[in-house]
C-alpha cells in the first residue's frame, strides 16, 4: 500500500493590508466570513482523514491577522482533528505588526514550535514603499516577545533588490538581521508577479529596480556575510544555523507529497498536483457540497515527475542524488540527462561529487535558468 503524505499546508488567506509585491491567494480581512472559513477548513481536514503528521505549516495571507479567539479556534480544532503525536515541526507565519502578546500566548499553549515572521526589510521608509503595515520597532518587539515566551525556532523573511534599494541598505538589513540572534532566515530577491501593484507600476515605467549586476552583488554579499556568521546556505533562498533547517520546506524540495488545505492552497497526493478554489465563497460552497475544494487537478507523467525532481532538488545545497533518481524512476540518469549535465558543468553552473549533483555559486544565482535546462521534449 502506498505510503500517505506526512506533511500538510494550511492556508489562511486573510490580510490586514495587501503588499505591493504579493501574488499569493489573499483578501483584505475586513467584512470577510472568517469564522465560516475556519469552520469549513475543519470540514476539509475531516474529508482527507490525514495520517499522523511529521510537519504542519500554516501560511497565508497572514495567519496572525486572525483575532486571538479565531487563532485559538484554529489551533485547538486542528490539534483535536489531527494526529500530531509524531509531529517534528509546526510552523505558523506571522507579521510583526499584528502578533500581539495575547496571540503569542495562544501559540504558546498550542503545539506550534516554529514561527516565521514576514519582516522583508528593517527600513521604515522602504516598508511603507512596499505596502507593509509594520515598522522596525515592531520587529524587535515581536522577536523579543517570542523569545520571552520560549520560542527559539524563529525565522524571518527578507526581500532584497527592492525598488530604489541600494547596496548600503542591504548591508544594513543583513547587520540588523544578524543582531536578532535567530537561527533561520529566508532571503528572496524581488520577483515581479502579474496582478500586483509593482507589476502595474513596472508596466507604466514607474518602478526603478536595481540592475542585474547590483542584484548579483547583493546576493554575493548576503551569502558571504551569513556564512561568515555561522549560517549554512542550505537552499537557494534559505540560511540556517545547524539543526534549524525548515523540515517542511525540505519536504517540498525533496519532491515529497503533501496535503494542501484552504482556499487557493496547492497539494500533491497520489501522483496528483491540485489547487483549491481561491475565492472564499467558491471555497465555502465547494466544501459544503463535496467536502473538498479541488479545482485544478493534474496527474504528473513520469517525465514531469523527473523534471520536478531535478529543479526542486537542485535548489538544495546537497543537490540531487543520481542513485536516488535512478531508484525512484527506474531509468539511467546518464541516458536521460547526461548531455544536459555535461553542458551545465562546462558553463560552470553545475558540479558533481560522489554521484550527487549540485549547483555552483554562479548556478545558484541563476537557479531558474539552470532548472529549465532539465525540461526535455520527449
Can you say where each PLM-predicted feature lies in the sequence?
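Local cysteine-cluster metal-coordination motifs and their immediate loop/turn environment
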Residues: 13-24
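A short, conserved structural fragment
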Residues: 345-355
